[in-house]
Swiss-Prot record:
The modification Phosphoserine is found at residue 970. This is Protein NRDE2 homolog. The keyword Cell membrane does not apply. Belongs to the NRDE2 family. It is found in: Nucleus. Residues 19-33 have a biased composition (Basic residues).
């Protein structure tokens, strides 16, 4: 999501109070007003009136809507609660320059505010300089990362920037149609400007802001020239880059206009539709209705474009997109819309959109043509507005299996009455329940509503009409199915999905990783709660299901498939969805996931009908009787539950019955899984026998010596034709080495890593999978065999967490080993180094793993965790991640003494996450704990004006302020 830190785009203003006896504009503010005029030169007409008096207890937000007023005591009535609004409270037209400090969060790109806690931070930065393994040391594995160069080297390099600019300019003259050259020119110009500033005065905050503005203006000028020269696919790249930069420079109205102009001129630029949605939902001025209308407009255009193509209308000469690409764009927008609705509190609407589209994808009646025409709308609206159970609801059978005149009344178990409370505290206590336990869509017909019912619980066809799509591509429908489960809290995506650029950019990034984070409720009584179960966020790895079952074998690692703290009705709906989809469509991967889900539910005693579990498992195995992957999963789960004999029988049956169907890759995978299960029960002889069966299929006596087997495995390593084959062979070779002791494990692992790198697959997902399995083997050796050899395996773990910082398994085992030698700080130091040097999803992942490290080592100390969050929230690409802010606010709620920085922190949180109700709720919680009820009321009003979904209300006569606490939403 684009950053919204710039001065030209309004933010929520601070909650700074203005006392009745203090003039908000005094001589002490002259310096600030001077900066005000300089920074907002492009908005001269919108400057604040200088004659505002203390009797005018309201401020006009000239950068937001014209009628945007904050009402003071007895001056204006508090606005009556309404569901939509044309104005937004709290838009700050300017950003304040704050005093420089070495620690703390950065406010609006200016400088850091020091955050004071009741305990001093004990993080020892000097330990960063400690030497680790060096070249030449036995077992050293070089890290494939770029290290920051020495400052003197950077200065030397910067002297050549002008020369590089000249060379690039000459290349542009020869090849003006290459976008890469124009972007390179922008980068060189930016480096030149910042290098000159750094050498002149690196402490001048105003100068730095000026350089940033100048750099942006220069790059925009370059891109404007480039857009006239570049054509084709490169043109879309440049347009996207141009609009991204421009959104930091222009006003929100101008940016919105630019986006619309480009999209009208180039409707085939599907990536721009995504950028448009990201921009719109990331700006604090836009209300919920504004954003929903924007999504509706995008959907209408893309669906019309898809309909025109299906009608065989003549393509535009510049239209190079396919139907598949358009459907991809629609799917991407659909997921983003549902996330947006969920974040704003409209969980019922988001769930209903998923339900409706799942009915169209998998339960579309055969007698209807897949076309969104009048016949379709008449039939589906009748189905949706009836009392018939919909997808994932109890007794749901699918739209195609329901007769037109059929209706079945469902039980309504949830109250939908709107509560009205007399205090903010009571309102918060009741409203926060819906944050952690959102209610389902009401299954009772809207015609039965009473005057006190909450209308947003009842979703009629008109509410979802603009957001339903008939996907014709099986690949898109397949992907949408897993997006639904990710929305429910099971972030599993088949490896094949990750090969697509749309899904790779979305699921490998922040969106996928955030599913693994523990919730803010993990913090109890001022401490980080004891170790929780963690979801493993690397679901796109090859052989992921097998890896996850292996992780389940180690109870101390405590991984899980889904969040057990989900609302009860969500878990029930998810289980019904699993059942409907597994038996209505052929999906081996989903069937395997469903088996794991059932086993975990049974293990955790969460299934109310345990006898039904075995019955469902048998039905799955019967339907997928010819599926090697499903039976392979079932065999491992039986072995995991202690049924070793049954597991042996299933593995043998796979080779006997499916021998003719087994591909070479599948054969390797099954043998690998079988051998690894033997390893985990310390059956060394059985493990060797299984591997010999693979190597010598004709030798029934299995008397071949181990040396010959080792030579064959080494030969297989030299002749791998694919990454997947190399992965399985390396794992089998590693298991063999563990069981035979013919070579040291560290040498074996180092050899396999070298093989990956020699093939050019040094940072591939297959190599990550290999690192994960090896971590588990090392963990098994340490916990079961009591064999600790940390000095030799430390380089392996350090390389693993650096290359694959999102991998919780590698981090957990690494932390375990270091804690045994009382070197708990080493993982922290490593995490800090990665956090400061990496970017994008890697930083996010590192932060998450650092959180795991804190829980594992110091569950009673959150200081390291706070410091890591400070650094993370300073990252321009990550500071808008609501999950960070929610946990950050929760910790500050428990640890921050006084109210000195509360205003600045809450303002920054609201400005960074303008479309997230959860952040607003945590801000209100923090303000109430600090006894700042008047400011909590303002945040409540902001929620109403933004259009967030609230299930309860505060009495109108309560929404007024004491004379001593009159508040004005003004610039910081």
């Amino acid at each position: 999501m684009p950053s919204n830190h710039n001065t030209s785009v309004p933010k929520f203003s601070s909650f700074n109070s203005v006392k009745a006896k203090k003039n908000p504009i005094t001589k002490s503010n002259k310096k600030y007003r001077s900066s005000h005029d300089q920074v907002s030169s492009n908005h001269a007409k919108s400057s604040f009136p200088s004659h505002r008096s203390i009797q005018s207890n309201f401020a006009v937000d000239t950068k937001g809507e014209k009628q945007n007023l904050l009402y003071g005591i007895n001056k204006r009535p508090v606005p009556k609660y309404h569901r939509s609004s044309s104005s937004v409270y709290g838009s700050a037209p300017l950003l304040r320059i704050v005093k420089e400090s070495k620690e703390g969060i950065t406010l609006n790109k200016k400088k850091s505010l020091e955050i004071k806690y009741d305990e001093e931070r004990s993080f020892d930065e000097k330990e960063n300089d400690e030497s680790e393994f060096e070249d030449g040391q036995q077992g050293f594995i070089p890290l494939l990362v770029n290290r920051n160069s020495d400052p003197s080297e950077k200065s030397t390099f910067s002297l050549n920037i002008l020369k590089a600019i000249k060379e690039t300019d000459e290349e542009i003259k020869k090849n003006p149609g290459k976008a890469r050259l124009w972007i390179k020119m922008c980068e060189y110009q930016e480096r030149l400007l910042f290098d000159e500033f750094r050498r002149s005065n690196s402490d001048d905050i105003k100068g730095k802001l000026k350089i940033e503005n100048n750099s942006r203006s220069v790059k925009l000028s370059i891109l404007e020239k480039a857009l006239k020269e570049v054509k084709g696919c490169d043109h879309e790249i440049l347009v996207s880059y141009y609009l991204q930069l421009g959104s930091e420079e222009w006003s929100k109205e101008e940016t919105n206009q630019k986006f619309e102009e480009v999209l009208i001129e180039h409707p085939g630029y599907l990536n721009l539709w995504m950028k448009y949605a990201e921009y719109f939902t990331g700006i604090s001025e836009f209300t919920f209705n504004d954003c929903l209308n924007m999504f509706s407009k995008c959907f209408k255009f893309l669906k019309q474009k898809l309909s025109d193509r299906k009608s065989c209308k003549e393509r535009e000469s510049t239209d190079v997109t396919s139907n598949f690409e358009v459907e991809e764009a629609i799917l991407h927008l659909l997921i983003r819309l549902c996330d947006f609705l969920k974040n704003c509190g409209y969980y019922e609407l988001a769930w209903s959109i998923f339900q409706a589209n799942m009915e169209l994808c998998y339960f579309y009646p055969r007698y209807l043509e897949k076309k969104l025409d009048s016949t379709f709308f008449e039939s589906f609206s009748k189905f949706w507005n009836s009392d018939t159970p919909k997808f994932s609801e109890e007794n749901a059978r699918g739209w195609c299996n329901v007769l037109d005149d059929e209706s079945s009344q469902q039980n309504q178990n949830f109250s939908s009455e709107i509560g009205i409370f007399q205090t903010v505290k009571l309102w918060y206590l009741n409203e926060s329940k819906f944050d952690t336990n959102p209610p389902p869509r009401s299954t009772m017909s809207c015609r039965k509503l009473s005057g006190i019912d909450d209308p947003f619980r009842y979703i009629v066809f008109n509410d979802i009409q603009d957001f339903i799509v008939c996907f014709e591509s099986e690949t898109i429908a397949f992907a949408f199915k897993y997006k639904f489960f990710a929305f429910c809290g099971v972030p599993l995506f088949p490896p094949g999905i990750s090969t697509n650029s749309w899904f790779a950019s979305y699921d490998k990034g922040i969106y996928n990783l955030l599913f693994g984070m523990a919730s803010s409720e993990s913090f109890i009584n001022g401490q980080i709660a004891e170790k929780n179960s963690f979801q493993f966020p690397c679901s796109i790895l090859p052989s992921y299901i097998d890896l996850f079952i292996s992780l389940m074998s180690f109870k101390n690692l405590n991984f899980k498939l889904f969040d057990y703290n989900l609302a009860h009705h969500v878990k029930e709906s998810m289980e019904r969805a699993f059942h409907q989809l597994v038996f209505s469509a052929d999906d081996e991967y989903l069937a395997s996931v469903y088996l794991i889900y059932l086993k975990q539910m049974e293990t955790k005693n969460l299934s109310e009908e345990k006898p039904q579990v075995n019955k469902i498992v048998k039905k799955i195995l019967k339907k997928y009787d010819s599926s090697v992957s499903v039976w392979n999963t079932y065999a491992q789960l039986e072995h995991l539950s202690g049924a070793f004999t049954m597991a042996e029988t299933i593995f043998k049956t796979i080779f006997q019955i499916h021998a003719s169907q087994l591909r070479y890759i599948d054969n390797l995978n099954v043998y690998k899984n079988w051998a690894f299960r033997k390893l985990l029960i310390n059956d060394t002889e059985g493990c060797l026998v299984i591997i010999k069966c693979l190597l010598f299929p004709g030798d029934k006596s299995l008397t071949s010596d181990n040396n010959r087997a080792s030579e064959m495995l080494f030969g297989m390593l030299e002749n791998c034709a694919s990454k997947e084959e190399l992965l399985y062979v390396c794992l089998i070779y590693t298991i063999w080495t563990h069981c035979t002791d013919m070579d040291s494990m560290d040498n074996c692992v180092y050899l396999c890593i070298q093989k990956f790198e020699s093939y050019g697959w040094g940072a591939s997902s297959e190599m990550e999978c290999y690192f994960s399995y090896c971590s588990l083997i090392f963990y098994y050796q340490a916990t079961t065999l009591q064999f600790y050899n940390l000095p030799k395996v430390r380089p392996f773990f350090e390389k693993g967490v650096t290359l694959f910082s999102a991998n919780t398994a590698i981090w957990e085992v690494y932390i375990f080993f270091e804690s045994k030698l009382r070197q708990e700080n080493k993982p922290k130091i490593r995490a800090m180094k990665i956090l400061k040097s990496a970017s994008n999803a890697v930083v996010t992942a590192c932060w998450y793993l650092f959180y795991v490290a804190v829980q594992q080592i110091e569950p009673t100390n959150s200081q390291y965790f706070l410091r890591t969050l400070d650094i993370t929230l300073n990252n321009e690409k990550l500071k808008s991640v609501a999950k960070f802010w929610r946990i950050y606010l929760k910790i500050l709620n428990l640890r921050l003494n006084g109210t000195e920085w509360v205003s600045a922190i809450t303002t920054k949180a609201l400005a960074s996450c303008p479309c997230n109700k959860g952040v607003c709720m945590d801000v209100i919680d923090l303000l109430l704990k600090k006894e700042m009820e008047s400011r909590a009321i303002i945040c409540y009003i902001i929620m109403l004006e933004k259009g967030f979904r609230v299930h309860n209300e505060i009495r109108r006569d309560v929404l007024k302020f004491e004379r001593g606490d009159e508040l004005i939403l003004s610039p910081n």
